[in-house]
Amino acid sequence: MRRAYPIQSEPSRLNRRARCIRPSKVGFHNFCKYVRTKWPNGRCDLKVALIGTHGVGKTTLVYEVCSLLKKAHHNVELVTEVARQSPFPVNAETTLSGQLWILHAQIAAELEASLRAPIVITDRAVLDNYCYLVNKFGRQPNLEAWLAWWMASYSLLIGVPPVEGAIPRDGFRSEDRAFQLRIHNLLIELLASPPFNNLPAHVIWLDAEDRTNWAYKIVSAAVPLIQGSTPTLLSNKAAC
């Protein structure tokens, strides 16, 4: 039986708190100045993935984060949700072929984005996409070694929690609240179990009560990473 986790209280070992520079305190222009000061010029790869179940505001949030970074004069590339381009069924009606297409398309999109900008922000990672496959077909050990290897390419993982209220209707994602929470719980379960429980990237879960400051918290958490940037596990393996 899968363990159910409360929405508002994520496992403490997954929640790495970051200092948030709030715009209400420093002003937007000072915030941009802070980002430019802490983020030195020069090319340095950084990939931040927003992970979570559907219908929680990830897509809106990635645009907000990219906007803040661009206004602070940084070269940023956005990877949008690839599932919307899938020719296969999605949501609870997904197929194994459809989920494999999404996983490969996600990786391909991230590779392309990394050629266009030193900073990449992604709407989802391969792991939360994998949750939909696990929900329908169970865990796939042969896939997980490959997925864990790719998960090492992310610099920072931002968990976006479910919020109270109905799922926004967009004509694409399922509006079934139980299905939404099942995917959320699966993501928590996978992050707490091998081979995904020892990823090099920190996982920061956002506070569901502080939606207005989410984008600023993400940027504040990402800024220090670029200063002492080190090659990712993926880069190290490629260099061997």
Question: Language model features by range: what are they?
Answer:
Residues L50:
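Hydrophobic anchor at the beta1->P-loop junction of P-loop NTPases
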Residues G55:
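Walker A (P-loop) phosphate-binding loop of P-loop NTPases
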Residues K58:
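Conserved lysine of the Walker
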Residues L61:
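Hydrophobic positions on the alpha1 helix immediately C-terminal to the Walker A/P-loop
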Residues S67-A105:
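Conserved substrate/cofactor phosphate-moiety recognition/catalytic segment
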Residues N91-V126:
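Conserved nucleotide-sensing/catalytic segment adjacent to the nucleotide-binding pocket
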Residues F137-P195, L199-N213, K217, T230-N236:
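A glycine- and Lys/Arg-enriched "phosphate-lid" helix/loop adjacent to the NTP-binding pocket
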